[in-house]
């Protein structure tokens, strides 16, 4: 039996963008220094490969790290983020998780560069995930997939876009809905 796929974004999902006073008590702030050679070649990152990148992330290893580790026993959990392999190098250790496969990449989906279907920035991810996992049950958690979260042609019995509020990120309520969906999807495959 083929395992369902859980595709995770980072910024706005595992790394909420809300004010410090609104972050979950389990969030830990980390300053990350990424050498230029490790900066993903992404149109979202200025100076990719030429300048070091310094950023602060708020991660919750006790909530998200434990959840990801547990779900990996039954599902294929992959990165769906412009962090790509850098997420494994810099974020996975902070979350207390083993490295995850990179499910989609801006470098292998060139349609992303300069295109955004009708202003939908996450359209490249939707296309890339559909191409990468055409016959798999798939849940995609992102803070910028609103157009897909409400699209009945994208959300089917075997594919669902679960959205997060970027200010709070991945909450226990969203995690519970995702887990319920994954359980139903794995039974119906």
PLM region spans:
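C-terminal cap/substrate-recognition subdomain and adjoining C-terminal extension
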Residues: 86-189
């Amino acid at each position: 039996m083929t395992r369902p796929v859980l595709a995770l974004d980072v910024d706005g999902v595992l790394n909420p963008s809300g004010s410090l006073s609104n972050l979950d008590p389990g969030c830990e702030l980390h300053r990350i220094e990424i050498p230029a050679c490790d900066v993903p070649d992404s149109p979202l990152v200025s100076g990719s490969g030429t300048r070091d990148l310094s950023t602060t992330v708020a991660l919750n290893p006790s909530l998200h790290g434990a959840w990801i580790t547990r779900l990996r026993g039954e599902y294929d959990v992959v990165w769906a983020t412009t962090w790509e392999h850098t997420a494994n190098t810099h974020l996975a250790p902070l979350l207390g998780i083993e490295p995850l496969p990179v499910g989609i990449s801006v470098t292998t989906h060139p349609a992303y560069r300069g295109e955004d279907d009708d202003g939908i920035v996450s359209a490249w991810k939707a296309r890339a995930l559909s191409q990468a996992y055409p016959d798999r049950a798939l849940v995609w958690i992102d803070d910028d997939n609103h157009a897909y979260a409400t699209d009945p042609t994208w959300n089917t019995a075997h594919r669902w876009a679960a959205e997060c509020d970027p200010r709070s990120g991945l909450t226990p309520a969203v995690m519970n809905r995702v887990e319920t969906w994954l359980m139903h999807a794995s039974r119906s495959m």
